[in-house]
Each structure stands twice: as structure tokens, then as C-alpha cells.
């Protein structure tokens, strides 16, 4: 496992008490967990939706810790055949958790295997071929499926309807991110000034994963410059060096906005056209960059495509077209 991955795991909260932000979701999860423990039943199936880096995987692990059960983690693209799911499900114990990241990318055949597993805790397996083929029903342990997706609209209705609990994670505010930065700094053994933590939080795109990534890189700058503490000056210098501006926009964010403004006259522009112009994957733009740009009012999605807002023109110091006056 890479050092960065080990660091990321170290920084992840292990309990609901340690988890910062998403208060309403946390409060509901706490109730559902307590009820499941009182009844000695598995937690109902849970679906987490929202942009990358907001804590979907972390919350799945936290739930397992709070319930005192094992968690088996996998992802939609990895589960190519029905047998892949069957092998995992039959090796779970009662009340264990199966976590499927990118659940919207499950092949249809695999998804259909999950229907009876989620509803009745059974698997219907076809044995043999041709006229001699027969169906065998296998009883499964009473497990909890936790799914995570950045693309709720791509999940089929039959699968979505089988989740008893659906949560949409929202971007974090600056105060929550500042607390996350300070907590991560303590774990990493870094001294950081209050205003430096505020600055990092302000430029973290509302996303804990980004906040932690920026903190680790700013630590590099501080150590190379022989600084014992991250102060506001070193934080700002490092953020400028990494092309992260006052609004949290990075180089790719600006390229997306400038493409809409300069190549498509401010839009509307189709996502495929934008992706082709940037030579970037369409899904990456939609999943990673677009949610924040929309949240902060840089672009709007219309039936005809993406449109750059007046705010985008102002921030990028481009001449504002008459239609936006």
C-alpha cells in the first residue's frame, strides 16, 4: 500500500464522534444503529450519494465500527460476474457489511443477483446448462449492503428502491473543514496556526479529501523551508505554488471555465464537447469538477448544456457579454 494511502486511512475517523460535519446524516445514522443493536438485527441497506471526497467510504467503515461487525469492501467495476458477488456474499457472517463503491457501475446481471439477496437474503443460482439446468436457492447470512455513488441518476430504480436508507452528502462549510484540518494536523504531528487552518479550509472546495491533500502538501513546503509550524504565509505561498486560487479553483477548474467562455462563447456547451476540447474524460468532469463549480455558482446546467455565469467571468477577469448584464 502506498504511503499516501496509509496516511489517508490514518486520517479517517473511526467513530461517529470523531466524524466532523454532515450532522443530520450522523444523527440519523446513530438512531438507526442503536435501533438495529436493540433488535439484534442487521442495519437496513444504506445508499450514500454525493461528489467524491465527502466521506461516503469513511461513513461505511464508521458504521461497521459502531455496529462491531466486519466490513468487506469492493467496487462496481470489479464485480464483473454473478459468481463474484455470490463468492463474497456466501463468505459474510450475520450482520456483516458489504460495501460497494461506484455501485452505479455494476453490470446488470450482477445487479439482478443482488435483488433477492437484499430483499430475502437468498441467492438464486443456475446450475448446469441447457435442458438439464436447474435453479438452486442458497440462504445467505443477514447482511447489510452499503452502496456509494457519485451518479445517483445512473442507479436503476429496482436497485435504488431496495435501499431502506438513502443519504445525500453535501459539501462542507469552512468551519467544518477548519476543524478537519486541525484534527488531521494533530494526527500527523504538525503544528498549524489558526489562520493557516482557516486559509486551507477556505480553499478546499468544501471537500475533506481536498483539505487533507492540501495540508499534506503544505507540510512538505514547510519542512523544506525548515519551518516548525505552518503559518498563514507558508500556507498561502504553498497554495499559490500549487495553483489553488482564493476560490479553491485549480488549473483544471479554470481550464473548464475558460473552455466554456472562450471556445463556446460562454455556452451553452455540451459536456461531450467540453471533454473533447480538454481531452479529459467526461465522467471525470461531471463527477470531480462540475459539482463544485455548480455549487459555487461558476456554471449552470441547462437543457442545452453548460453555461458560464457572470461570476465566472468576473473571477477569471474576462469581458462580460451583454446577455449577462
Swiss-Prot record:
Quote the EC number: 3.6.4.-
Region listing for Head domain (RuvB-H), in residue ranges = 246-325
Single GO biological process annotation from the record? DNA repair
> One GO CC term of this entry?
cytoplasm
* Positions of region (Large ATPase domain (RuvB-L)): 1-172
Single GO molecular-function term? Answer: ATP binding
Enumerate the UniProt keywords alphabetically: ATP-binding, Cytoplasm, DNA damage, DNA recombination, DNA repair, DNA-binding, Hydrolase, Nucleotide-binding
Question: For binding ATP, which residues are annotated in this chain's numbering?
Answer: 11-12, 53, 56-58, 119-121, 162, 172, 209
Q: Which family does it belong to?
A: Belongs to the RuvB family.
- General function of this protein: The RuvA-RuvB-RuvC complex processes Holliday junction (HJ) DNA during genetic recombination and DNA repair, while the RuvA-RuvB complex plays an important role in the rescue of blocked DNA replication forks via replication fork reversal (RFR). RuvA specifically binds to HJ cruciform DNA, conferring on it an open structure. The RuvB hexamer acts as an ATP-dependent pump, pulling dsDNA into and through the RuvAB complex. RuvB forms 2 homohexamers on either side of HJ DNA bound by 1 or 2 RuvA tetramers; 4 subunits per hexamer contact DNA at a time.
Name listed for the protein in its UniProt record: Holliday junction branch migration complex subunit RuvB
- The protein's organism comes out as Thermodesulfovibrio yellowstonii (strain ATCC 51303 / DSM 11347 / YP87)
Gene (name only): ruvB
